[in-house]
């Protein structure tokens, strides 16, 4: 039952999918944390895998960069493959001075400069928020592991290289914790088609201070975030 962008067979995906932007990161997650792994799709090298984690079936697939790419894969996973839970896992740039590099941010809501949710909501503003059950599961997992997390709004940007850096001042004033490029679109798709979605990201750099993590620090923090998220996923 291939779609235009996924060539997996029916039933290839678990109900819960971890959803990093980078397909090679999806491969890394599958090979590092899952058992009995099978690659289930590879159209346009957007790799997807299904395996087990602590005995529960879990999938992981790349979403690509930005809301348009993420929305395509999220829509097909939900509508054509019956996926119920999509958890974006990735990195972001911090905005708030209270947020530090290596912190983990849970995107309770996603602001955006994209028009996609207005297009699907008849021109009105749509509250792009995470699913409470998914969010609570990850928060509880973080408590068990002692992982430092921040819960609040992220900003899903259409442009990586923004022509208006003064917008960062507005974001900080409004309490935005970090900037990424997918969550608002993912939340919109999930609400439209009756699925559940969440964005969990590590802070790889601080937009305001210029501080950046090293590659080793980034990998360690990412691994901790993935374990925390997988432990939450098996409770769903």
UniProtKB/Swiss-Prot annotation:
Cross-referenced PROSITE patterns: PNP_UDP_1
Native source species: Shewanella sp. (strain MR-4)
Keyword Glycosyltransferase on entry: yes
Family: Belongs to the PNP/UDP phosphorylase family.
Gene designation: deoD
GO MF terms, alphabetically ordered: purine-nucleoside phosphorylase activity
Protein name: Purine nucleoside phosphorylase DeoD-type
Reaction catalysis annotation: a purine D-ribonucleoside + phosphate = a purine nucleobase + alpha-D-ribose 1-phosphate; a purine 2'-deoxy-D-ribonucleoside + phosphate = a purine nucleobase + 2-deoxy-alpha-D-ribose 1-phosphate
Its EC number(s): 2.4.2.1
Top-tier EC class: transferase
Positions with a binding annotation for a purine D-ribonucleoside: 5, 180-182, 204-205
Any one GO cellular component localisation term in the record: cytosol
């Amino acid at each position: 039952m291939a779609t235009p962008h996924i060539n997996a067979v029916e039933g290839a995906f678990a109900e819960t999918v971890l959803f990093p932007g980078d397909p090679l990161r999806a491969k890394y997650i599958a090979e590092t944390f899952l058992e009995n792994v099978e690659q289930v799709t590879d159209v346009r090298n957007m790799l997807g895998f299904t395996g087990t984690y602590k005995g529960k079936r879990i999938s992981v697939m790349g979403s690509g960069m930005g809301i348009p790419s993420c929305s395509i894969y999220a829509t097909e996973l939900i509508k054509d493959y019956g996926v119920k839970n999509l958890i974006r896992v990735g990195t972001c740039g911090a905005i708030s001075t209270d947020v530090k590099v290596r912190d983990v941010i849970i995107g309770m809501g996603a602001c955006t400069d994209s028009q996609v949710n207005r297009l699907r909501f008849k021109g009105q503003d749509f509250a792009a928020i995470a699913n409470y059950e998914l969010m609570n599961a990850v928060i509880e997992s973080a408590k068990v592991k002692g992982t430092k997390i921040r819960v609040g709004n992220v900003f899903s940007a259409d442009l990586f290289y923004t022509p208006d850096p003064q917008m960062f001042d507005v974001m900080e004033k409004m309490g935005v914790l970090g900037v990424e490029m997918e969550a608002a679109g993912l939340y919109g798709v999930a609400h439209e088609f009756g699925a559940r979605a969440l964005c969990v990201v590590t802070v790889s750099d601080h937009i305001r201070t210029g501080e950046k993590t090293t590659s080793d620090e980034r990998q360690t923090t990412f691994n901790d975030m993935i374990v925390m998220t997988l432990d939450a996923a098996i409770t769903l």
